[in-house]
Structures are given as C-alpha cells and as structure tokens.
Design a protein with these regions (language model features):
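Positively charged n-region of N-terminal signal peptides that target proteins for export
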Residues: 1-6
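General helical structural elements
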Residues: 8-9, 157
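Bacterial N-terminal signal peptides
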Residues: 9-18
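Boundary at the C-terminal end of the N-terminal hydrophobic targeting segment
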Residues: 19-24
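N-terminal "mature head" segments of proteins
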Residues: 26-31
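Predominantly extracellular/secreted and cell-surface proteins with exposed
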Residues: 32, 36-138
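Edge beta-strand at a domain terminus
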Residues: 123-165
Length: 165
C-alpha cells in the first residue's frame, strides 16, 4: 500500500509540473490599471471590459466594429458625434464603461482612473507639468510611474490567441 501511494504521488507530480509551466503561456485576459493619471492615454482593446472615470478632460471613443460591444459614457458637459464610430466627450467628472468587442479610447486630461480586463495595448504618456503623472499596474503587479511626455510607455495586457489554420 505505501508503494502505491508513493507511485501515485510521483505520477501526480509528473503531470502537475508540465501543466503548471504551460499555464504561464496560455492565452487569456490580463488586467491594466491606471490611477491618478494626468496626461494622454490611448487604450486599444481587442476584447474585454474597461471602466473608469476622469476628473477633467476629453475622451474620444472609437468603436471600429459597431454592435460588437457597448460603450457607456456619462457626466460629460459636451458631446460631439464625429461619425458613426467616433464620439468626443469633454467636461468634468466623466465616467465611462466599455463591455465587449473592440474599442479605442483616447483620454487626455487629469485624474484619469480606469481598469481594463481583457486583451489590448495602452500608450501611457504623463503630463510633463504634473507633479505626479500617475501610476499603472499590470495583472495586479507592482505600481509603476507613468513616464512624463515626450517619453511614453506602450504596455500590453492579456494574451491574444494565435490564429490557427
């Protein structure tokens, strides 16, 4: 009986180690968080959800594939519809949420906070005149300072599945 138990434990170990190593490379959703951002942020989401708020500034929403997701914005003082897929919002205390589908958000202002869950990229550029242009974190990791413009940082969150043929 003890020999069977030992064999079973060793067999489980042989199966678990490769599975754990493969788990680090699987495709899936990532998380990008921005806190107290001042400057310019451009988020290109391939899929997923994003929600946040901006104390003051301008938000340009691009929905490249109409109907594949929904974009909700509230609190804007001014709204300008540029085309079927592009809308510009400006003002104070703007809140926004994107659910599903592809999206592009261009946020320029102060007090930008958001969380993006899914797959995408973000270009982060802090306001050079700001005392503290904000911090960001990937996958609940350590918080990193947003670089001040003209320096920017391109960050990716999540892993897009590769196309199979």
């Amino acid at each position: 009986m003890p020999m069977r138990r030992l064999c079973l434990i060793l067999l489980c170990g042989l199966v678990a180690v490769p599975a754990a190593l493969a788990g680090a490379r699987v495709t899936g959703d990532g998380v990008l968080e921005l806190s107290k951002g001042d400057g310019l942020v451009v988020v290109n989401g391939t899929r997923g959800t994003l929600w946040g708020q901006m104390d003051k500034g301008k938000l340009v929403v691009t929905d490249p594939i109409l109907g594949d997701g929904q974009v909700f914005v509230s609190g804007a003082d001014r709204t300008h519809i540029v085309s079927d897929s592009v809308t510009v919002y400006a003002g104070v205390d703007i809140t926004f949420r994107v659910t599903g589908g592809k999206y592009k958000l261009r946020l320029q202002g102060s007090g930008i906070d958001f969380t993006a869950v899914g797959v995408g990229t973000a270009q982060l550029g802090g306001d050079v005149l700001a005392d503290h242009p904000g911090v960001y974190a990937l996958d609940s990791g350590t918080w990193n300072p947003v670089p001040a413009f003209p320096a920017t940082r391109l960050v990716s969150f999540g892993v897009q599945p590769t196309a199979t043929q």
